[in-house]
Amino acid sequence: MINPKITICRLQQQKNIYFLSDFHLGAPNAQSSLEREKRICRFLDRIKNDASVIFIVGDMFDFWFEYSTVVPKGYVRLLGKLAELTDSGIAIHFFVGNHDTWMKNYFQQ
């Protein structure tokens, strides 16, 4: 019997799996983060036609404090791009890192 907590991903033929991590948006400053966010979005645009699954495995953001009732301002480009990709059928799995632990179940909500 398969553990119900384990998700089995079926790959589409001729599609790839991508593992992304350590964007650290928010550090060291707003300008650097904006430039990095734009590069990440361009990369996601390049891979969207051959991606089956994307795993974001920690530290997408870089915040050393917890948000319990609000969402940090900014990064709408990246969040919108991730929504666009999931709407197109690409599975995205997000794991929190030590710099973005506040995320917890943000994407599920």
Predicted regions and their residues:
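Acidic, histidine-bearing metal-coordination/catalytic regions of metal-dependent phosphoesterases
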Residues: 1-16
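Core catalytic region of metal-dependent phosphoesterases/phosphodiesterases
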Residues: 13-16, 20, 25-109
